[in-house]
């Protein structure tokens, strides 16, 4: 059976704001099965935001584990991310999960992968999913040449450019901005 997957998630820090957004399309093989899937979630009363790409069931499993880690470590996002990455890499069950996550708060952007990586970007941009390279390229250009835009506006424009190019990305966006 084919998996439901494919998406674009992008996060940007710009002028003191951090925003994250994702498109809403879910596909099964080469067929669109749903136009609006919410792939960005608020955690810790909106203080932490999480975007995910990959197998939906796997992503939700990881999201639940990440939320548990956030609670265990009193909202310390970086510590929770590192502990999740350790578990993800070493646990026999979790190791088989096929998803990636971007987590953000008012200060940090982190990418968490199943290979045990927790990556903090040098350029204040992270992206995952099928249209990630289009969104990341657009975000880099916007940060360099459209500095008057806010972080949420840059996320929207980056996703829009990715959706124009990537067949697995649509224009139904959910965009959130981290709060203090």
UniProtKB/Swiss-Prot annotation:
It is found in: Cytoplasm. Its main location: cytoplasm. Belongs to the peptidase T1B family. HslV subfamily. NCBIfam families: ATP_dep_HslV, PRK05456.1. It is an enzyme of class 3 (hydrolase). Gene3D superfamilies: Glutamine Phosphoribosylpyrophosphate, subunit 1, domain 1. GO terms for molecular function: metal ion binding; threonine-type endopeptidase activity. Allosterically activated by HslU binding. A double ring-shaped homohexamer of HslV is capped on each side by a ring-shaped HslU homohexamer. The assembly of the HslU/HslV complex is dependent on binding of ATP. Its EC number is 3.4.25.2. The active site is at residue 7. GO terms for cellular component: HslUV protease complex; proteasome core complex. Protease subunit of a proteasome-like degradation complex believed to be a general protein degrading machinery. The gene is hslV. This is ATP-dependent protease subunit HslV. The keyword RNA-binding does not apply. CDD domains: protease_HslV. Keywords: Allosteric enzyme, Cytoplasm, Hydrolase, Metal-binding, Protease, Sodium, Stress response, Threonine protease. One of its GO terms (biological process) is proteolysis involved in protein catabolic process. Na(+) binds at residues 163, 166, 169. It catalyses: ATP-dependent cleavage of peptide bonds with broad specificity.
């Amino acid at each position: 059976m084919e998996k439901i997957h494919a998406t674009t998630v992008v996060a940007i820090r710009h002028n003191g704001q951090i925003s994250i957004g994702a498109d809403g399309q879910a596909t099964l093989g080469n067929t669109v099965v749903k136009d609006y899937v919410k792939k960005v979630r608020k955690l810790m009363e909106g203080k932490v935001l999480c975007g995910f790409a990959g197998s939906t069931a796997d992503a939700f499993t990881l999201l639940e584990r990440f939320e548990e880690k956030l609670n265990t470590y009193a909202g310390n996002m970086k510590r929770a991310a590192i502990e999740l990455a350790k578990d993800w890499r070493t646990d026999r069950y979790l190791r088989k999960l096929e998803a990636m996550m971007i987590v953000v708060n008012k200060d940090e952007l982190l990418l968490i992968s199943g290979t045990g990586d927790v990556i903090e970007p040098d350029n204040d941009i992270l992206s995952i999913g099928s249209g990630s390279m289009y969104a990341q390229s657009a975000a880099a250009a916007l940060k360099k040449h459209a500095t008057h835009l806010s972080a949420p506006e840059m996320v929207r424009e980056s996703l829009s450019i990715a959706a124009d190019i990537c067949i697995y990305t649509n224009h139904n966006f959910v965009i959130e901005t981290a709060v203090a």
